[in-house]
Amino acid sequence: MNTIYGRILFLFILTIFGSCTIYEKLFDNPVDFKANEERGIGAPSFVFYPKTQSVTQNDSILVGSFIVFQEDSIEPFAGVHLQIEFPNDLIELDTILPGLFITDTNKSTPLFTYTYNNESTVDIYTYFLDTLKQDINGTGHLADLIFNPVSSGSDSIYYNLGECEMIDHLDQEIIVNGIRG
C-alpha cells in the first residue's frame, strides 16, 4: 500500500516540476546601445520602438523613433531629418508628434515639421532651438508616429538611411552608422 502512495507522490512531484516552462527573456530596449551593438547595429543609429506589434483592425499603432549613441562617442547635434517608409496598403498615417528628447530647456515644442506624400513615405524634420545651448547630446526620443490599420497582414516600417541625416548647429553632417527598424 505504501508503494502505491509513494509512486503517486513521485508522479505528482515529477508532474509539478516537469511541467514548468523556462522562458528566455528578450529585452527590447531601443536605447540600449550594447544590445544594438550585439546585433551589429553601430552607433549613432536610429531605432524604432516597439520592435513588433500585433493589433486588431480597431487599434491604433504607436511607433516611437529614437536616436542612440554610445556613451564614449556622443556627438552634439542640432537637427535631424528622418525619412520613414511604411506599407500604405496595410496602415495609414494618422498623427506625428515630437519626441521629448529634442525639446529645449524651457520644455517648449521644438521646430518640428514633416512632409507626407499620402503614399508610403513621411519626412520628419526636427531642430533643437534654445536660448542657452546650440546643440544637444545624448540618446533619446525624437518622434511618435501613430498609424491606423487598413487591412490585415504583416510588414515593416523602416528608415531610408540614404535620406536620413543628422546635423550640428553649423549644418555639418554627422554620420549615422546604422538603423534598427
Where are these regions (language model features)?
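Acidic, low-complexity intrinsically disordered segments
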Residues: 20-181
